Amino acid sequence: MKVVRISELPRESAISPLFTGEVFRQVIVDPDETQSFNFSIVNFSAGSRNKFHQHTSDQILIVTEGTGVVATDQEERTVSAGDVILIPAGENHWHGAPGGTPMSHITVQTKGSQTQQNEP
């Protein structure tokens, strides 16, 4: 068993062409410590988000702080702390804090899932 204190996790800048604005990542469990999952926190500063993309596995988002948006090709939904979102494998989507408040979420995916960016 391993207990992780989120308040003690280092925040690293998430520099990637997938993100717009200032985004930070906190790895909850090192990929070498689990056989099944990628598990981290993504912290979106106000005005930041990721671009449209899709994954080869389902993705679960658990909003831990703030208010943000999760969008697909068909809809945009406002989400806030306590909301849980299931994004099926292959669904084109984006998520983040495009408005005036920051938003953080835990992301859970199957280990080995691939991400395809679909927005320049």
Could you say what each language-model-derived stretch is?
Residues 57-69, 73-74:
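Glycine- and acidic-residue-biased ligand/ion/polar-headgroup-sensing regions
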Residues 86, 100-118:
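A short hydrophobic beta-strand segment most commonly corresponding to one strand
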Residues 50-52, 70-71, 87, 92-99:
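Short beta-strand His + acidic residue motifs that chelate non-heme Fe in jelly-roll/DSBH
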Residues 31, 49-55, 96-98, 117-118:
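Short histidine-centered beta-strand/loop micro-motifs
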Residues 40-55, 89:
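Conserved short histidine dyad/triad with adjacent acidic residue
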Residues 74-90:
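Short acidic-glycine-tyrosine-enriched beta hairpin
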Residues 1-36, 116-120:
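A short, N-terminal "cap"/entry segment at the start of jelly-roll beta-barrel domains
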